[in-house]
Amino acid sequence: MAQKENSYPWPYGRQTAPSGLSTLPQRVLRKEPVTPSALVLMSRSNVQPTAAPGQKVMENSSGTPDILTRHFTIDDFEIGRPLGKGKFGNVYLAREKKSHFIVALKVLFKSQIEKEGVEHQLRREIEIQAHLHHPNILRLYNYFYDRRRIYLILEYAPRGELYKELQKSCTFDEQRTATIMEELADALMYCHGKKVIHRDIKPENLLLGLKGELKIADFGWSVHAPSLRRKTMCGTLDYLPPEMIEGRMHNEKVDLWCIGVLCYELLVGNPPFESASHNETYRRIVKVDLKFPASVPMGAQDLISKLLRHNPSERLPLAQVSAHPWVRANSRRVLPPSALQSVA
């Protein structure tokens, strides 16, 4: 179904607003376990929004859910408990009054965004995600703003950050790690097919849905690059690939390096090149000074070693990550029926 473009004017300058259908960063910080209820059975990330059982999502005359196309104000929402705090604002659990649809409402302060000079980055995030609809990518349903704030209506990820779960358990087992690798490979293949490079895959930027399914979030460093070649440095120190440290041109293969680092961290509990100083970390990354504890299974070592290659062209392609024997033997990826239909 063709989606209707959000007609809100962009609050900065004369540029027109991007589409209201996109995915944006959400860093959800939780202190208490989630207790699913009828109101927390929310939509899957790549399908039309659905309300809780016994409740109906209101649609407009074209059959498109209102949450995607309607002009909202803050008065249209019941605001619940805070989910997280960030540099530019806060995230709250919220319910749209008309449809009772549960969302995460991210409230950004214009003054802080302007102070840090990141208006362009915010707009870029929205533009990049305008057409990314995938079961393992967090979705942005809509946005609106007033004189002081910008509000992003996001998919709610009830189980919060992957980072928090990793902190609690220290390491993940083979099944959970392989499942995450398959989910990531599939989602990134989708992104790369649309010429989108994430560039900052790490546990803090990965959220978990109701059934534990992965949701890629925080596209703050991502870029839509038709040439797929850029030279700017970004990302998290422990996850930076050699080509970015060395200031060389890079492409979508930076994401292959990142998921190799992630796989190692999930199994071991810390990134592979972590050191006491930044300079030492840089040195180890550039030299690909990779050492495995005896606890890392041989199959996982093989996968990680094929991803963490200094030469980007030698890194294992995403399709082969999904098909890797260790991933195939251990992954327990489960998609909702509607998601299976859409990615078939």
Swiss-Prot record:
It is an enzyme of class 2 (transferase). It is found in: Nucleus; Chromosome; Chromosome, Centromere; Chromosome, Centromere, Kinetochore. Activity is greatly increased when AURKB is within the CPC complex. In particular, AURKB-phosphorylated INCENP acts as an activator of AURKB. Positive feedback between HASPIN and AURKB contributes to CPC localization. Inhibited by ZM447439. The keyword Cell division applies. GO terms for molecular function: ATP binding; kinase binding; protein serine kinase activity; protein serine/threonine kinase activity; protein serine/threonine/tyrosine kinase activity. Gene3D superfamilies: Phosphorylase Kinase, domain 1, Transferase(Phosphotransferase) domain 1. The modification N6-acetyllysine is found at K215. SUPFAM superfamilies: Protein kinase-like (PK-like). Its EC number is 2.7.11.1. High level expression seen in the thymus. It is also expressed in the spleen, lung, testis, colon, placenta and fetal liver. Expressed during S and G2/M phase and expression is up-regulated in cancer cells during M phase. Its main location: nucleus. The modification Phosphoserine is found at S62, S227. It catalyses: L-seryl-[protein] + ATP = O-phospho-L-seryl-[protein] + ADP + H(+); L-threonyl-[protein] + ATP = O-phospho-L-threonyl-[protein] + ADP + H(+). This is Aurora kinase B. It comes from Homo sapiens.
